[in-house]
Amino acid sequence: MKTIAFQENIPVRETSFDVVVAGGGVAGIAAALTARRAGKRVLLIEKSTMLGGLATLGLINLFVPMCNGRGKQIIFGLAEEFLRFSVKYGWAIIPEEWRNGEPATPTNVRYIARFSPHIFAISILDFLADAGIEILFDTIVSAPVMDGKHCRGLILEGKSGREFVEGKIIIDVTGDADILRRAGVPTVTGGNFHTYCCKGITLESCQKAVESRNIADAIVGFRGGSANLYGGGHPEGMPLWNGTSTDQVSDFLIRNQQELFRKIKDQPKDSREIVTLPGMAQFRTTCRIDGDYTLKEEDHYRHFDDSIGAICDFERRDFLYEMPYRILTRSGYDNLITAGRCASGEGYAWDILRVIPPAIISGQAAGNAAVLAIDSGKGIDSIDVSALQRLQSSQNVMIHFDDALIPSDSETSGERGEDYGHI
């Protein structure tokens, strides 16, 4: 590839920050809010024009199960707070058994919530702005500025041109490990199937909403690619995308939007409308940190001394996991940390970590870790994890699951439940 030499003096933003959060998805929102509640000056940078990431802009508006499939809630903390907030101002679908908290009697019905993505986006923005978090929209992080393995800050690109922002702790929650990769942190790329969905309405769905008096009934899904989580339905011979290059992202979007058009073009044109296309590529796994530990599918029912939160399998009942702090860090990088989709998990464990509730809990942990690192003067890769666990626990996060929740009936443990579609 040809190269050119390019050099310029980049202005430095007058304000420096304790914590700079790159990425306004649910993990980034959780990290930013946690650090701000601890009194830190926080900058949240989002490349699009709304908060929420895949949960809002990406139209994957589902809190997957936060319980064990037998009526016991596992995931609490900011995940519970955000779930309740997501349904406060817009339409909501929560199973009746869970509308008032954990049910009094065991149930196989799982604790999920579907919500209005756009109303959640604007309501959470109002919430964060009132909390005093500084937010930059339509701004891309183009590069970290490194001093060895220490990140001095980030080069930003926006309507003001290029500028540099300083931060004591940098949290990469871009979803694609963009900062980590460019900082030289070891990373691992994923592969994504031919999957794409958008939201629309039809005459039939609108009639149903009128009859039910529930606007949620008006909303239907339209699909481009229809491959499932495991690749079922992925066209033979079609390549997978890792989503880490401009060409890959563009090819994914072009193929899927063309397929969507082919599917709807012959329908009566007055009978349906696409209300919104996803504002980002709906990749599941693109690039993540090669962390100090990598969570594996077979780690279910395993306890970790450095757990930052217990989580559950969103497809299989009973399967419980703990997220070790080491999935967010890489030793030697003293002020870089990640969370959410960029956390270190392989195979199906990566899928477990990337969905909304676990992403929020790991984001909450990253925010708390940033606070501890700043207050103690230690590197974020060497903080007192027991202090982090105490902070998480004080914020209603279950650190270790109770072994009493491990079923003795191995035949029913791990049963797959409802198919939650494109997640």
What are these regions (language model features)?
Residues 1-19:
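Extreme N-terminal leader/targeting segments of oxidoreductases
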Residues 8, 34, 40-41, 47-143, ...:
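Conserved N-terminal/central alpha/beta ligand/cofactor-binding core
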Residues 19-42:
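N-terminal Rossmann-like FAD-binding beta1-loop-alpha1 element of flavoenzymes
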Residues 28-29, 51-54, 105, 144, ...:
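Flexible loop/turn segments at secondary-structure boundaries
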